[in-house]
C-alpha cells in the first residue's frame, strides 16, 4: 500500500488510515477539532444548509473527505462526528448546483465564492507554450513594475494548492529597485558576520558529522557563493537579487513545507503571462531558518520561519529565441 498525504501528518490521520470511517467509537471518546494552522488555530469552519434549496443530491457528501456532511432520511445534515471538523476547503459549496450550502470561518465567507468561467480555459498547447517560454531572468530593464501588475501576480499566486486551508504562506514584497538592493546588502552583511560558519576550516571540522552530499554541496557551492556575494557587495554589485525592480519572499510557518514553493511557482507563471521575467532565488531562506533575528525583525519576517524562497521580477533586458528540453532524473511505474 502506498500512501501520499499533503500537509502535516497528525495522529488522527494515522488512526484513520487503519480505522477508516465510520469510527464512532473513537470520536465519542475524544473531542474532534479542526487541524491547526497559524492563522486560525484549531477553529472549525461553520457549515450551514438551506433546506429549501437542497435536493439531497449527495454531491457535497461525496466531495467532503472530512465526513462533515451526511444524508439521513433523504435529508442533508451536518455530521456531529466528523473526522477533524470542517477545515474550510469549500468543496461542498463549490460543487453544490443549487447554492444550498454556505461555509463561514477559517478565513472563509460566502462572498469568497464565485461562478467558474469554463468557456475561456486554455488548452494543453497554450499552457505548454507558456511553460516552454519561461526562462530564469536575471537581467532587467531599469523600469518599475506597476502596482496593478504586482496585485495580479499576488492574486494568481494566492490560488496555489496548499497542504491545509487556510494557507499559512506569507509574502514579503520589495516593490522597488532600491528596496531590493537594500535587502540584498543587509543579507550579505549578515552572511559576512556568519562567514566563519561556512569557511573551509569550519567545513573540515564538521566533515565527520556531515553526509557526503551535504559536504559536497557546501564545498562546491555554499562556500564559494558566500565568498562571491561578500566580495561583490564591496564593489556595490548585487549578485544576490540582481537589482531587480521587484522581489517577493514566500515563507511558511506551520504550513506544509512545499506551500511557499508552490505559491512562488504560480507567481513566476503569472509574471510570464504578464510580460515579465522572473527567477527563483533559493540562497536566502536556508540561512534565515535559525539565524538573523535582527534582520528578520527589520523586514517584518517571523522569528520562526520554516521554508522560504525569493522570486525576483522585472521587464527582461534579453529575449530568448530558443527553448530547452528538460528531463527528470528518472520516471518509472510500479
Language model feature labels by segment:
Residues 4-9, 18-334:
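Acidic, surface-exposed loops and disordered segments
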Amino acid at each position: 500500500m502506498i500512501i501520499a498525504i499533503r500537509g502535516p501528518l497528525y495522529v488522527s490521520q494515522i488512526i484513520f488510515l487503519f480505522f477508516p470511517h465510520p469510527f464512532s467509537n473513537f470520536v465519542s471518546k475524544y473531542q474532534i477539532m479542526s487541524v491547526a494552522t497559524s492563522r486560525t488555530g484549531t477553529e472549525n469552519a461553520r457549515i450551514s444548509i438551506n433546506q429549501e434549496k437542497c435536493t439531497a443530491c449527495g454531491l457535497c457528501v461525496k466531495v467532503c473527505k472530512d465526513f462533515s456532511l451526511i444524508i439521513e432520511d433523504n435529508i442533508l445534515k451536518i455530521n456531529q462526528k466528523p473526522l477533524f471538523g470542517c477545515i474550510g476547503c469549500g468543496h461542498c459549496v463549490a460543487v453544490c448546483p443549487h447554492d444550498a450550502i454556505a461555509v463561514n470561518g477559517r478565513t472563509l465567507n460566502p462572498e469568497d465564492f464565485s461562478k467558474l468561467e469554463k468557456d475561456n480555459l486554455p488548452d494543453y498547447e497554450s499552457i505548454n507554450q507558456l511553460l516552454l517560454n519561461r526562462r530564469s531572468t536575471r537581467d532587467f530593464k531599469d523600469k518599475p513594475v506597476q502596482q496593478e501588475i504586482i496585485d495580479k501576480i499576488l492574486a494568481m499566486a494566492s490560488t496555489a494548492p496548499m497542504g491545509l486551508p487556510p494557507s499559512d504562506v506569507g509574502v514579503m514584497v520589495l516593490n522597488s529597485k532600491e528596496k531590493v538592493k537594500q535587502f540584498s546588502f543587509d543579507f550579505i552583511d549578515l552572511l559576512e558576520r556568519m562567514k566563519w560558519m561556512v569557511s573551509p576550516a569550519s567545513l573540515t571540522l564538521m566533515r565527520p558529522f556531515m553526509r557526503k552530499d551535504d559536504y559536497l554541496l557546501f564545498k562546491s557551492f555554499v562556500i564559494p557563493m558566500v565568498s562571491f556575494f561578500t566580495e561583490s557587495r564591496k564593489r556595490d554589485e548585487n549578485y544576490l537579487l540582481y537589482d531587480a525592480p521587484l522581489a517577493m519572499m514566500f515563507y511558511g510557518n506551520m504550513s506544509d513545507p512545499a506551500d511557499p514553493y508552490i505559491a512562488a511557482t504560480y507567481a513566476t507563471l503569472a509574471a510570464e503571462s504578464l510580460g515579465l521575467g522572473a527567477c527563483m532565488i533559493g540562497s536566502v531562506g536556508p540561512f534565515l531558518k535559525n539565524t538573523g533575528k535582527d534582520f528578520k525583525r527589520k523586514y517584518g519576517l517571523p522569528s520562526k520561519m520554516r521554508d522560504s524562497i525569493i522570486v525576483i521580477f522585472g521587464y527582461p533586458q534579453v529575449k530568448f529565441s530558443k527553448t530547452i528540453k528538460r528531463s527528470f532524473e528518472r520516471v518509472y511505474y510500479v
